[in-house]
Amino acid sequence: MREVNVSKITDAVKQLCIETNRILPADLEETICKACKTETNDTGKAILNDLCRNMDAAREMQIPICQDTGMAVVFVEVGQDVHFIGGDFEQAIHEGVRQGYVEGLLRLSVVGDPLERKNTNDNTPAVIHTRIVPGDKVELLVAPKGFGS
């Protein structure tokens, strides 16, 4: 049995919230930049060029690629031989989202109750999908879901 302190989950989720809003995977960035050079439609070329400029600006200024940083959707694979210590696992994820969105200066746009429309001001709660898998590892993937998607 492997023990994992939930503070490590909080730290990892915080960092992933910030990074996933600022940096695209290298293969996706490369594909977009290649498309900029080969696109023949003027509108398509303009959109792709905007995306490339946004990626460059995000990297240089440490800001989000897009102003819509969305709602954090967290996919977790937890090994059946993992035992969390130091607190509640789901609360650790929500705290990581809270810290990542606030400290990363990401747009806070989640409401606590859809009828009251009151902003939580920290982008919680996150949507959490958890799978139990064999082993003693924990894998986290944070996917910000923009509200236009």
Located regions from the model:
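Non-transmembrane, aqueous-exposed alpha-helical and coiled segments at domain scale
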Residues: 1-149
